[in-house]
C-alpha cells in the first residue's frame, strides 16, 4: 500500500515511500494569475474582459498539467514499489481550512491518480485522515504533542521524522 498525505502548506502530497511534491508551484502561479486578473479588471474594457477569460484558461491549463504530472509520478511510485493499492486521504473529510481552490486541486488530483492507477491495475482508496499527523507510524501511539509544525517525535517510543512523511505512512 502506498499512502499519500495531502497538505495545504509546503507539500501538495507526500508518499509513504518519501516522495514529495511541492504546493508552492501552484500557490505561486495562483497569486500571479490573481494579480493579472485584478490588473485587467481595473480597465473594464471589452478587451480586458476577454483577456481575463484567457488568463483563467491559462491558469486552469497550467494547474491541470501540474496535477497530471504529480498523479503520474504517484502512480509510478506505486508501480516501482510493487504497491497494489494507493491510499489517499478522504477528501470529503479533509481539513476545514481548505478553500475552494485547494478543494478543487485535491479532488482533481484524486481523479487523475484514480484513472492513471487503473491502467496498472492499482486500486485507489480514500482513508479517514483523522489523527494521521498525530499517530506514530512506528508504535501507533496517538497524541497531539507528537507533532510540532513539520516535525514528528513520538512521546512514547521516541520515533522522529518529518510530520507529513509520518502521516503518509499512517494513511497507507
Predicted regions, residues:
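Positively charged, helix-rich recognition surfaces that bind polyanionic ligands
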Residues: 1-172
